[in-house]
Amino acid sequence: MEHKLSPLPYAIDALAPQYSQEAFEYHHGKHHNAYVVNLNNLQKDTEFEAMTLEEIIKKSSGGIYNNAAQVWNHTFFWSCMKPAGGGEPTGALANAINGKFGSYAAFKEAFVKSAVGNFGSGWTWLVKKADGTVDIVNTGPAGTPLTTADKALLTVDVWEHAYYIDYRNARPKFVETFFADLVNWEFAQANFA
């Protein structure tokens, strides 16, 4: 099956000034799109051509896996942000976060520290473990919880291309802004349910 670049779940300028239209033009329009194009080219005439994106991620390796995982990760990441985002989670997810970390503030501090400390290019995830608890997990360049027993709830992209246009080399400022103004807790809560 041919994969398509998923549209953003909001207007390209909807997250400005915290995430600019220019950042989306490069991050979504060029980087994310390149993963889609590469995946389509790499899977041609292989067993993966008839599989869903999730099946490809779970069964492939090398370039096909890297591009498939990056397509999925980016599509997921766009939904982790929303216009006028921020705030704190509620309900069962808030209870799980408080149960694991003691408070939302302690969770946020741990997540920011983990994301800032994620060496090189990668992703920092809030995941639901098989036992129903939550945890923070760092993955490398194309890592994704889809290949584990964890369920992705929320992620922040810490590849430099994710934040360099708006934040230059200030990854901590980007991650702090993600929580203050962009995070979509409703999406994470729906994933937790």
Language-model region placement:
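Feature for soluble, non-membrane regions of globular proteins
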Residues: 1-193
